[in-house]
C-alpha cells in the first residue's frame, strides 16, 4: 500500500517568503526537468519582479558566483546572504590600531630624556646650547642692522655735512660709515659763524700759494688808500688814523699765515686752490661787508683808542688808487660780495632781518673787534 501526498503545498506561493523568488525558482526547475522542451500548458507570463530576479541571477556568475541552475537552492541562498554580508563589513574592522599624537610626543620626549642621560656633563651641554643660541641671535641682529642702515646717494650740495649726518636716524650704529668716493664729492667749505648761528657755504676757496705777494699788495693798497683819506676826512678822529693803520695791517697780515679778511685788508680768491677748514682759522676773523650798491664800497677802520671811522669810495677812485695788476682781485671781491649779498646760484637766500642784524652789528661801536687778536674785546 502506498501513500500519495499532494504537491499543492509546494507549488502554491507563500506570501511571507516572497512569491517572486519561488516562482522564479519553479520555472527554472521545470525547464531543467523537461530538458529544454516547452512545458505543457500555457506558459505563465513573468511579472516585473520575475524579470528583475532573472536578470539578477543571469549576471551573478560574472561576480564569481556559480550558476544557480547547477547548484542546489540551499547553497544559492547561503552564498547570496554571505555575499550581502561581505558587502557591508562590520565597523570594528575599519578602525586601525594607531598611536595617538599625545602618546607619540610622550614617546619622543622619553627617548630624548634617555639620550640626555648618557651625556657625560649635562651642564656643559646646556651651556653650549645657550651660547650657540645667543650667537645666532646676535648674528641675526647684525644682519637686521646692516639691512636697516641704508646710505643714500651723497647729494650734499645744498646741505652741510654736519647737518646731514645729524639729520640721519641711525639707532643701530655708533659711528656712521661713508665711502671714500662720497667724501671726495664735497667741494664746499662750511663755516659756522657766531652771528645768528648760520652756515655759510663758500664756493671759492682761499688762495694759499700766493700768500706773500697778496700780503705785500694789500699793504701797499692800504698805505695808498690811507694817504688821501686824511685830507678828505672832516672829523678830528679820522686825522689820527693814517699813521697806525699801515702798521696794524702789516702786523695782522704778518701774524696770520693766510690772507684772511679782517678789519683793514681784503682777500684774494682763486678757484683752483686748496680749501680752508674751520679748524685752521678762527670763526671771528671772517666777516661780511654789506654793500648798499655795487658801485659804493664801505671800509671800516678801527683806531688804537677804539673809535670807528667809515670811508666811502666809488669804483673810479678805487680803480685809480689800486695797482693795475689787482683787477682780478677786484673782480673776485665783487663776486665774493655779490655771493653774500644775493646768494650763490640762487640757493642760499638770506632773509632781510638777518642782513639788518649784520649791518647793525658791524656799524654799532659796542661790538669792538681786535684786528691783531682776531676776537671780541
From Swiss-Prot:
Alphabetical list of PROSITE patterns matching this protein: SERTA
Organismal lineage: Eukaryota, Metazoa, Chordata, Craniata, Vertebrata
InterPro entries attached to this UniProt entry: SERTA_dom, SERTAD4
One Pfam match: SERTA
Provenance organism: Mus musculus
This protein's name: SERTA domain-containing protein 4
Domain SERTA: 101-147
Tissue expr: Highly expressed in adult epidermal tissues and in digits.
Comp. bias intervals (Low complexity): 221-257
An example Gene Ontology CC term for this record: nucleus
Feature: compositional bias, Basic and acidic residues: 306-317
Stretches for region Disordered: 36-66, 221-259, 306-325
